[in-house]
Amino acid sequence: MSWARKVAMVASLLAATGEGSVAGDFIRVKETEDGAKLQTAVFGYEKDGIRVDLIGAIHLADRKYYEFLNTYFENYDVLLFEMVGGENLGGGKKPIMVEDPEKEDNLAGLRVIYETMEKALGLTGQAGLIDYTAENFVHADLTMKEFGALQKEKGESLLSFMIQAGISAEKPSRDPNTLNLMRGMLTGRSDLVKLELMHTMAEGDEQIGSLAGENVIIGDRNAKCMEVLEKQIAEKEKNIGIFYGAAHFPDMERRLEKMGFERVSNKWLTAWNVKKE
């Protein structure tokens, strides 16, 4: 696997950490002569008067993508969100700063990756713009202790999961053009870098999404989200959004179908809008 593809795979995992039900269904690239757009899906499912929308997240995007989402989320009775260790957010609560050395150690590497890619791509980080204090936000992910314990139990790490995603791919990802990547980085042309990474990111989500099952990063976190969903349904909520990385959604869609939900609508939101030379 080339270094350029590894960069794009890491970016795809951040969107996780869319013929058939594969991740290619939930994230796509739309190209024209003038530009290209990386888009995430909003797919709607219904059962017995209950509406559930899967809203695909990408954790580095254009600022206006997140600004639109903050307004869009107001339409839901409850909005279930992903964030390992985010149990102190949502429900109108102000963020609580908790000193947790284990959490700092686990997330230090990811924070460096986020900051590096934000600068290289000229994008904005999700965590800094999404309003996680909103009244209708409900945490639907593992706590940091749950996440760490499950990874230890299964011998899983972020690195091992990435490697497995690359090995298990049914088809090779499209390699970015290394010369174009370097030219973009050296000249500060973030548009060139994004154009090269778009397709590999979308295909990387497909590879990651294919690994649903007995793993922590996709399978166990999705199971926790479905537990929270069932609780909200039991509390008579009728209009529910789930804001999660697009790579989670092939497995999550299967879980919804087992619950009797059927897909009834789809729309696409533009996360990256890049003009070509």
Regions picked out by a protein language model, each given a short descriptive name:
Residues L14, Y76, L256-M259:
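Alpha-helix boundary/capping residues
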Residues A8-A16:
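Bacterial N-terminal signal peptides
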Residues N215, G219, A223-E277:
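A cross-kingdom marker for long, charged
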Residues G20-D220, K231, S265-K275:
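Structured, acidic catalytic/metal-binding patches in enzyme active sites
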Residues M1-A8:
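Bacterial N-terminal signal peptides that target proteins for export
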